[in-house]
From Swiss-Prot:
The lineage of its organism: Bacteria, Pseudomonadati, Thermodesulfobacteriota, Desulfuromonadia, Geobacterales. Catalyzes the transfer of a phosphate group to glutamate to form L-glutamate 5-phosphate. The keyword Amino-acid biosynthesis applies. This is Glutamate 5-kinase. Belongs to the glutamate 5-kinase family. It holds the Pfam family PUA. One of its GO terms (molecular function) is glutamate 5-kinase activity. Substrate binds at S55, D142, N154. ATP binds at K15, T174, D175, T216, G217, G218, M219, A220, T221, K222. InterPro entries: AceGlu_kinase-like_sf, Asp/Glu/Uridylate_kinase, G5K_ProB, Glu/AcGlu_kinase, Glu_5kinase, Glu_5kinase/COase_Synthase, Glutamate_5-kinase_CS, PUA. One of its GO terms (biological process) is L-proline biosynthetic process. PANTHER family: GLUTAMATE 5-KINASE, ISOPENTENYL PHOSPHATE KINASE. It is an enzyme of class 2 (transferase). It catalyses: L-glutamate + ATP = L-glutamyl 5-phosphate + ADP. It comes from Citrifermentans bemidjiense (strain ATCC BAA-1014 / DSM 16622 / JCM 12645 / Bem).
Amino acid sequence: MRKELLKKVKRVVVKIGSGVLTGENGGVDPRFLDGLAAQVAELSGQGTEVVIVSSGAVAAGRQALGLPDRPRTLPQKQAAAAVGQSRLMRAYEEAFSSYDLKVAQILLTRDDLANRRRFQNARGTLDTLLACGIIPVINENDTVVVDELKFGDNDNLSALVTNLVEAQLLLIMTDIDGLYTADPRTDPNATLIHQVGAVTRELERGAGGSGTSVGTGGMATKLAAAKKVVKSGVAAIIFAGRGERTLSRVMKGELLGTLFLPAGESLNRRKHWIAFTIKPAGSIVVDAGARDVLSRHGRSLLPSGIAQVEGRFDRGACVRVLDPEGVEFARGITDYSSQEVEKIRGHQSSEIEGILGFRYGDDVIHRDNLVLL
């Protein structure tokens, strides 16, 4: 199955973590980049388009600034990123030029993808670069981004970029062999999981947390990234990037890492954008009856099923939909503001106009704007 799936891949996103990209001194490892460039050149020669999502700017800047530890404050991180980004791209240019490949730097913030027009512009730029045979190297714009516009980590960014460029595969190169049944660093009985059909809550709970001393993402963020892409019908593989030609071997179908199979029913591009790209502005808590109707029958969310409103949001905002236990199970675009929802919650749709003095529609969230997670 793995080989057959990979034969169909014509465009792939490769995410490279700081723990893979950096050497023992904390700076960018030129030998790794040379090996990566050779493998990307091989894939390009076979007709596969490659988009790289690369960490490493902060790590490169930290080395240049002589910082002993990973920067902790936002100004320190932004200063390190400002110094390190040019060094990172210079290292990519030097490595890839040896194989007659050109690279292009793309810096993104979450707002670039949350805004639909800027999303389309970014996609157009990337499509043009790929058509010209240029390898895009994408990173978060750490020098200017603030917390509310952050992707969170480059694992999440790589999942959103996969949707942005309509790639058929996401490859996450990390410093561990893949997803294990338990943390292999602490449990000698942990075994590698070669294939995952569905990302369950049990898998998410067992994924653990923190990243390395040079990166921000642990296995939990990689699992979350895989979950995002499989919901749009795209496969993902998490594998160790430091092995011998592992990128080429994975693309040839060798049994390395953990393969996440695409979901049977995939989200369309718009619903994927709603579910994973827009940052939620608030939450709506529904009762058990509404949860069942939404989950099992794919209906719209009516005001009668709403128990509580959390946060302040305007009409047209993305909101989380929580069950009575506070567990998020859906996201959607609301047709009413938080103040309006607060007034009409628990009431029938026929009462909306009498309460508010106007009526946008019967639904607080229409089913076309609602995504089950």
